[in-house]
Structures are given as C-alpha cells and as structure tokens.
Amino acid sequence: MALRDIKPTRSELINLKRKIQLSQRGYKILKMKRDGLIMEFFKILSEAKDSRGELLRRYKHAVEMMAVANTVEGALGVKAAAFSVKETPEITLKSKNIMGVVVPEIESSKVKKTLADRGYGVLGTSPVIDETASSFEDLVEAIIESAEIETTMKRLLDEIEKTKRRVNALEFKVIPELTEARDFIKMRLDEMEREELFRMKKIKARGSS
C-alpha cells in the first residue's frame, strides 16, 4: 500500500481501523487453526510410523511365504491357487473432516477370506498355500490402512503450509502496511488540524488589529 495513494480523511482512518481489527481477528483464528493442524499432523505422523513398520513387516512375511509356496507347490501350483479365487476385495472411499480439511476414509471388505472363499479347496494343496494367501491378505489390509494415513498426512501438511503462508502474510505484510497507513493518516490529520488552528489564529489576530 503506497502512502502517496492514501487519502488522509477521517472516513479513511475509520475504514483502516476496521480493516486492522478484521485482519488481527483473522490472524488469531488462522494461527489457532495452524497450531491445531500441526497437532493433528503429529498424531497422524505417529500412526504413520507404526503403519509403515507394520506394512514392511507384512510385506517381508508375504514375500517369504511366496518363496516357500513356490518351493513346495511350484510356480504353476501357486498360480492355479491364485486364479481359483473368484471374489476380489472391495474398496469404498469415503471422507471425513479434520479441522476443515477433507481427508479420505477407506473401508474394505472381502480382503480376508475363508478356505471356501479362496476357491482352491483343501485337497490337492498344502497348508503353505493357505498361509501364503493369508499373508498376502494381511498385506493388502496394511496397504489400505497405510494409504489412508499417508494421504491424510499429505493433505494436512498441504493445509498447514497454506495456512502458514496466510498467517505470515497477515503478520508481516497486511497488518504492518495497514498500521503504517493508519499512522500516516493520523499524522496528516494532526498536521492539518494544527495548520487550520494556526490559520484561524492568524485570521483572528488580523481581525483584532
């Protein structure tokens, strides 16, 4: 806001005071929102660490079980068991609100299956196939949970950065500029008042001489 463009009037002074009040109120609200979002982010971050660890553990276990199944049943036996599964997991994507931020809520069904659901039956396959299938079902569940948490983290982080930029803009640019403009108008009005008073005194002095 260039000071030369400001009209030093009382109405403009009132207008600037109102803008400063609104900006300060907005600054406080945004600061509270930013702090709240940061707290939520660190809660999710703690969950994310656990989720990543569990995902890695289940992934390693599933890979190990696949290696064992390939050794015991052979690649063709494993593929035959995999292709016998008729129902695939169902994913429902919903949303929830965390301090004004819309984040995903993922619901899944038909991930964990019984022997009957898997379709390959007990006869002709070893228990290793069943253990391998179960380990990959566990892995899918971990992936779904991790996807929800990681996406939530990213959206919260994006909103934190956006809110921080707005807080900084108000604190270091908008409010200081408005305050400077207000002080400038007050100074100019005081000067004009003194000039008017001096002029009136001169007129009065002339009239009495």
UniProtKB/Swiss-Prot annotation:
It is found in: Cell membrane. Disulfide bonds: none annotated. InterPro entries: V_ATPase_D (IPR002699). It is a peripheral membrane protein. The keyword Thylakoid does not apply. Its main location: membrane. One of its GO terms (biological process) is proton motive force-driven plasma membrane ATP synthesis. Keywords: ATP synthesis, Cell membrane, Hydrogen ion transport, Ion transport, Membrane, Transport. The keyword Transport applies. GO terms for molecular function: ATP binding; proton-transporting ATP synthase activity, rotational mechanism; proton-transporting ATPase activity, rotational mechanism. One of its GO terms (cellular component) is plasma membrane. It holds the Pfam family ATP-synt_D. Signal peptide: none annotated. It comes from the Archaea. Has multiple subunits with at least A(3), B(3), C, D, E, F, H, I and proteolipid K(x). Belongs to the V-ATPase D subunit family. Component of the A-type ATP synthase that produces ATP from ADP in the presence of a proton gradient across the membrane. This is A-type ATP synthase subunit D. It comes from Methanoregula boonei (strain DSM 21154 / JCM 14090 / 6A8). The lineage of its organism: Archaea, Methanobacteriati, Methanobacteriota, Stenosarchaea group, Methanomicrobia.
